[in-house]
Amino acid sequence: MSVDQELIETQKNWIPLEANPEVLTTFMQSLGVSKDWEFCDIYGIDEGLLEMVPSPCVAVILLFPITNEYEDKRYKLEKEIEEKGQVLSDKVYFMKQYIGNACGTIGVIHSVLNNANVIEFNENGFFKQFLDKTTSLSTEERAISLLKNSEIEKSHEISALQGQSNVPQEDEPVVLHFVSFVHVDGHLYELDGRKPFAINHGESSAETLLKDTANVLQKMIDEDPKEIRFNLMGLVKKPNEESEEEEEKEKEETK
């Protein structure tokens, strides 16, 4: 058995991150993302609530429960894609998850690195170095690279302990899971490290990312209407105070 395979089978577990925008923002910025970017709450998928999300919003992170119904649909969809294929841009940055409870961190990585063309990085920070090191690697090799990275493991632990909720133990069962939605090359992709590949949810654009993600979530809700445990966060550029003042002024003038 190779050292890498032994690492995978050892199944390292981390403390789960809290679905808290402040926690994820601090975590992301500590790893080299410009302070111009932050996570914010998305309070619902109705059009009015989506309009409250600052623009640009370049990624959406969804926290949801893993149920038996979801797992059945997941395996069915994966089999269908394996048989029929799907459009998958080579520009999509996707990695597998080999660390227990690391889905929050992987959701942040997927959100950030699929927007490396618009997000500013610290040249010496984790994200820039990890992207440079892993761009040419396979999804499995990227996961192994993360598994071996002590810097992000330490940052994850610090952030996990900063949340407002009670901190679970590393080996405590967790049924909630983070996935990321991003727009790449004209399509909406769902990025979930538990799945073998990114899922293409159809045509999209930078402008319609929020609406298109909301449509996917609505389908999930329709399939299991009893399940209401969802949490949404957006990766957005911090609103410019001057721009906000101008917008308020325009609103007043149009009244």
Curated annotation (Swiss-Prot):
Subcellular location: Cytoplasm
SUPFAM superfamilies on file: Cysteine proteinases
E.C. no: 3.4.19.12
Molecular-function GO terms, alphabetical: cysteine-type deubiquitinase activity
Gene Ontology BP terms: protein catabolic process; ubiquitin-dependent protein catabolic process
Site description Transition state stabilizer, residues in chain: 97
Annotated InterPro entries: Papain-like_cys_pep_sf, Peptidase_C12_UCH, Peptidase_C12_UCH_sf
Domain named UCH catalytic: residues: 13-237
Gene Ontology CC terms: cytoplasm
Predominant location category: cytoplasm
Keyword Amino-acid biosynthesis set for record: no
Region ranges (Disordered): 235-255
Site (Important for enzyme activity): 192
Keywords: Cytoplasm, Hydrolase, Protease, Thiol protease, Ubl conjugation pathway
Pfam family, one: Peptidase_C12
Reaction(s) this enzyme catalyzes, per UniProt: Thiol-dependent hydrolysis of ester, thioester, amide, peptide and isopeptide bonds formed by the C-terminal Gly of ubiquitin (a 76-residue protein attached to proteins as an intracellular targeting signal)
Record carries keyword Protease: yes
Enzyme class: hydrolase
Family: Belongs to the peptidase C12 family.
PANTHER family membership: UBIQUITIN CARBOXYL-TERMINAL HYDROLASE (PTHR10589:SF17)
Name of the protein: Probable ubiquitin carboxyl-terminal hydrolase
Species of provenance: Dictyostelium discoideum (Social amoeba)
